Amino acid sequence: IIGDKANAESEDVSKEEYILSYLGIIEKSEDDEDIQKSITRADFADMLVKALKLGEVNDMQYFDDVDFSHWASGAINALAKAEIVNGNGGGVFEPDEKITYAQALKMLSKPMGYSVYAEANGGFPTGYIKTAVMTKINITLQNSDSLSMGEAIRLLYNAFSTKTYNVSSVKGSDGRNTNQYDVSDDTLFKIYYNLYIDEGTLNSYYGGAMEGASEVESGECIINNEKYSVIFNADIKDFFAENVEFAYIKKSDTQKDIIYIEKQDSGKTTVINSEDLDAFDESAYQIRYYNNNTLRSVSPRRDAEIIYNGNSETSLTLKDIIGGFIDKKYRGYVKLRDIDNDGGYETIVVYGYISLSVSGQSSDGKIIYDEYSSSKSIDTDAYEKVTFKDSNGWEYTDKLKTPSVISYAASTDKKYLEIIVSDKTSDIKISTVIESEYKIRDENGTEINVDESCFNRKKNEIKQSMNISVIYDIFGYICYIGKTEDTIKSGYLAALAAEDSGFDKKVMLKIYTEDGKLEVFNTSGKVKIDGVSYDEGEAAAIYTA
């Protein structure tokens, strides 16, 4: 799911919980156990009052067992005043008893407009359960005698996203009044929050557009030819050319703010990483690739739209693009989409990234230079729409550091440029060099790819047993190699001696290090003992100190 950054970080947050917490109806739970716990009648009353924006009532007590000292008295009184609840008989509400499924349905039926229908179809509890099935707000329960917080959230979401009922009394030919039920176009989400739940295909975003789709500015997207604002800091690219369900708040006819979006499970999708590509058979119009070490193939439609690095491509063929991956010109992926679910792939979305090690920028910051290859340098000013992202897809606003590694995807028409800044680093001790494959193994035997440009320029530092400091690109390739940072070692001084080579004098230290080894170190440059600095040549002074 995608929402604002703080909430989207937890992948376990359901759509229902996210939207209700966004609207302020509930607080997002930090503990899965809280979601599983049974809730009371008071808990559900509190949720419903917040959802309906009723406001608490604290000047009238409606139930004998809910005095003003009860934490939920204001909410329970508000529901009673609105004639949504009438208690369990005898003037009591039983606020601290566990709420049942049927009781929750009865509370929801009045604001939804279904209470008359439910009473006419059996009353409490069967009529309300039948009505829930009819309106499709029903949920699967773990326990029929109680309702968990998670179940209450789903039930409340279903009720608020379902169209309400209008009930009118109509006199028949026999003179009797009968109820007439009409489904309205309104939902409780629309009535109280101007919030809509919709679905469609994401045709355009700031970074790419399908054929015929309008271009948008930063923070916007097009779904089914309607423009929406994306008000959270997240990477909407993952939903490009996908069928999506989304929630938006309508501020005006021209201002619609998406607060939530997710992919729908409709239309077949095949994603192939560039590392798995084997070949492209032009005569069969077939892409061959490996999946779990098994050679497979997929055949898109010959008239399929190809979107390369955001732009509907006309100058490059699918053979050209696949060939570029196989020849290691760039790294990325191919996504084939059957958007209309007719069994054929009519849309092919491709992103091919070139990675470089940043050695610096032009004085105006528009040209980014590569440390190892001048041909990889990129002029951002040559592109119409430029986005910087971090490796998580969030907007990157910091100044580029030197050294650092970026991966960029540029459309052939100079319209779109996406730059992703990698933040993955590590220190490695090389155990094996596989020069023919541009790979190394670390001391744990892990095989690591090295970018070809980096490998060729840093051959002298890519040697067995050497310690290197590296920065990876977003695909796990080493694209920068530097010397490991000097480390601080501590231990016990075992012996001290002065060495006189005839040209200079140095002090040798024999130290038991933290890992239990006895090692000899030479002083170099400045030596500081108890806060006093000495030049390395002052052997006698160091020895005395």
Model region roles, listed by residue range:
Residues 1-74, 81-146, 160-236, 245-247, ...:
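Feature responds to low-complexity, polar/acidic, surface-exposed segments characteristic
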Residues 40, 100, 148, 299-301, ...:
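Helix N-cap / beta->alpha transition motif
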Residues 44-48, 75, 101-108, 152-153, ...:
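Amphipathic, non-transmembrane alpha-helical segments in extracytoplasmic/periplasmic proteins
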Residues 154, 164-227, 231-545:
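Short, flexible, surface-exposed loop segments at domain boundaries
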